[in-house]
Amino acid sequence: MGSLTIQIGRHMVRLWIIAVYVFLAAPRGEAQPIPSSGGDGLFRELGCVSCHTDLGGDMPIREQAPDLSQAGLRYRTSYLLEFLQKPGRVRRHIGRARMPDFHLSEKEALALALFLEQQKEAPGNWPQLPGELRQMLDAPAAAVSRADFDRTLASGLACLTCHALNGQGGMIGPELADVGYQLHPGWIKSYLVAPALFGVPTNVMPAQFYRLSLDGEKFEPIFPQSERAIATVAGYLSDAGAERRAALDQKLAAARRTHPQGSAGLGEQLFRSLNCAACHRHVSIKPREHAAPPLASEGLRARKPWLEHFLRNPTALRRAGYHPGDGSRMPDFRLAVDEARMLADDLMSRRTSLPGLKTNVTLLPLSVFSRDKAIHLLQEKFSCLGCHRLGNVGGVVGPDLGGVSSRLQPDYVFSIISNPRQLVPHSIMPQIPMPAESIELIARCLVMGGWSNGPATYLSPIDLPMAATLDEIDSRSRTARVNYLRHCAACHGTEGRGDGFNASFLLPAKPTAFTDRGYVSQRPDDTLFDGIHSGARVLNRSPLMPAWGTSFSGEEIRQLVQHLRAFCQCQAPPWSGDGSGQRP
């Protein structure tokens, strides 16, 4: 637990400070009133628009979820480790907002907890504190008997009107028996002094012990010895969670031993990858603008039965994240059946026109011969499986193709193969040159081929070096470095070593290591240009390397060539020039 020394008048005062809100969560299927605004209202109440920003509108979750700039001052690290792996319901007065489950591993949860442990941003100055209150805040929590606690409550406090204690009392606020293992003792005392200073409206948590003077300059006790009452309440609640606290501390110690490489730095990478700042305010980390797919045209893209099932049981469509390698995930909100149905109805009603969408596409039946021919084209000629997985073959850059038949409408499948950049302008998927009959054949194979989904687990952001370059990836600038990171690094690695996260899924094919001076220095710039423009197939290498000629201008490809040469710190061979000493 940390403290903060601040200037109040002529005095330096040490305060234990924290923001008010606790993590929010609700168990799957628990009945709650459905918002009158229907699926759109539920969509916003859950905070979906925080990541799916194309829908815009109000984001009430930003005011309901805790400001994590001060998480290290309020939450015990051992509690965070458990909660991040198994988020449970804490508060009940905020409608259907909840903390979703990101299905974090222990290694991931530890790193994120260690990052949050360090977040101790100090808020502004407090009003003047009475001397006895300063002493109480500085004093360690003392053991308090249940009898003393009950007498203090009976003196006029209304805690159990909203809160329960061991299941007895109100059902609006957090269970008081849990705060001793969840929160630092110093924060409990500071919060009880003045909930309103932590952003809690008085109609949610009214002042029980102190009120602000009319001029807002100092605290005034509501009844004699208010500071002693706070010490009694905080002491009892802190002690009540001692047994659970000890057990959680043991789990934290064991996790540290199991994952000695866990660090706050990796936790920050997770925090950014998962876009935690989209719902949780943070003083220095801002929400990502492009962390999830646009949904304004979902009714033209998805099939409703699949969508409804996916909302209740989200799986990894893009195992490395929405943008390949960013580590983002679709979290599990543990939706009830009626919630998933309402959201699916709302999303299917969103039919903003898609440029390039070919409608009323008719796909002929798929014979065994046609299926085998399509598979041959996918594996031996076209580069689709360099990014997508089908069965047990292919990369993990794009969505798994196994579930296309149940997930996507045929019109969309045909159109995305025909011209992906027209349909989804910011997609990195290139337009692969292929005859119309091949487009139709592959669309039939995917829609009618009877494929099953592949592995449905996410790759960890901790193991994705590209997750450390989110600011550059999200910028969508067109510099050579950003173009390389967005389009090439998944296979060739962020530093050009041929060790991108997708490389192991392409074996026996191996991406070129541009750090190999002996290899790259023997290739003219024209050769590298051709490989980028037309794909590795024109260089008699793996067809899994796509042709990027429709994605980049000629000048952008030339800049990429020079970016690749920077990895090996080598130039084109002298014989490839024009004799002038200048590069061609």
Language model: regions and residue ranges:
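Electrostatic cytochrome c docking/interface patches
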Residues: 27-44, 120-154, 241-272, 351-379, ...
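Extracytoplasmic electron-transfer domains, predominantly the class I c-type cytochrome c fold
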Residues: 32-33, 50, 56-121, 166-242, ...
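Short, cysteine/histidine-rich loop/knuckle motifs that typically chelate Zn2+
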Residues: 50, 161, 278, 386, ...
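Bacterial N-terminal signal peptides
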Residues: 14-25
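The −1 position to Zn-ligating cysteines in a subset of zinc-ribbon hairpins
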Residues: 47, 158, 275, 383, ...
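Accessory recognition modules or surfaces
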Residues: 448-476, 489-515
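Short Cys/His-rich local motifs and their 1-3 flanking residues in nucleic-acid-associated proteins
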Residues: 53, 164, 281, 389, ...
